[in-house]
Amino acid sequence: MRVGLLTREYPPAVYGGAGVHVDFLVRHLREVAGMEVDVSCMGAERPDARAFAEQDSRFPDGNAALHVLSTDVAMAAHCGSADILHSHTWYANLAGHLGAMLHDIPHVVSAHSLEPQRPWKAEQLGGGYRLSSWVERTAFLAADAVIAVSRGMAADVLTAYPQIDEERVHVIHNGIDAHFYHRDPRTDVVESIGIDPLRPYVAFVGRITRQKGVPHLLRAGQRFDPDVQIVLLAGAADTPELKAETDDLIAALQGARDGVIVVSEMLPRESVRQVLSHALAFLCPSVYEPLGIVNLEAMACETAVVASAVGGIPEVVADGETGLLVPYSPGDTARFESELAARVNELVRDPGFARRLGEAGRVRAVARFDWASLASETVDLYRSLL
């Protein structure tokens, strides 16, 4: 079987959970399942994938979404040799949809997020958000199968697109590379970025987007125990408005307490692993999260997780067993921030409890989110469609 896998992100250009998912799915399909996988991605050339330019020179000032659609058309023209197409995120969904119609082959879409659940994307894409929403809807309604990365995501798919037959939606969770993500005893990276190894710290790793809830974390940080350090490994903000808001909150937090460390450049995975390994807790204050691979990464490093109880997070983080969950309501964000701080302070007061949560987290991550078994489920789905 030859799989045509369509994606925007592909190593080394991986910046989110969907890219991590694609990376490990392709590895396991090729190396474990022995399948032929033709990867079509966007951006610079890669040795093991066909790369398509993200910019169309015919309209250099056009909305970013138009450039994506132009790339999708080029992708669709080159996937006729596949037996099945599998697209990831709206960036590649149209390529899969057009390719399936053009070449008469089945199309599987993986739902890593849903545009109707992310209205703040309009702030970033402008009118392009209406295009991305149209692309996703069109591809999902026509797809032969939809893979949801959590049960929560499956429910969201059926709510957003009730025309989809429930039998076409299949839950296959994201996985974790437990061989790579493990507790790192070294502290050289931790110390090099300014963390005091003699004081506890909590860590956030992720993009600064509306989805990730960083402003909530920063406001909650005003109530954290004064001895705990706050470490943010956070990339650039999605929009100038969000950057200004985040910068103001960081400045206010740094003015109120010491030990607030912000690392804006992307660190190597090995460095992130070490920071996760020595944290008292990993913080995930997302307001929307279909699964949250980074929670699995923290758990595999034996670190407790304090996270919002949204989307697929409760399927990963067992409340009171591998971490602590905080209810989130968009109508009462002040309460969320207060309870987030309370859960962090609970672990500061009882580091032994935090250690037990972290140890149980690795057991759960390894036992339930193994990539080999999840890739096998994906292969079984492919075969059922041929």
Regions inferred by a protein language model and the residue ranges of each:
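Glycosyltransferase donor-sugar binding loop
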Residues: 43-45, 176, 229-248, 261
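A short helix/loop element that forms part of the nucleotide-sugar donor recognition site in Leloir-type
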Residues: 182-195
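Carbohydrate-associated surface elements
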Residues: 152, 175
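Short His-centered aromatic/hydrophobic patch
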Residues: 87-92, 111
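Nucleotide-activated donor-binding/catalytic signature segment of Leloir-type glycosyltransferases, i.e.
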Residues: 243-270
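Aromatic "clamp/platform" in nucleotide-sugar-dependent glycosyltransferases that forms part
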Residues: 287
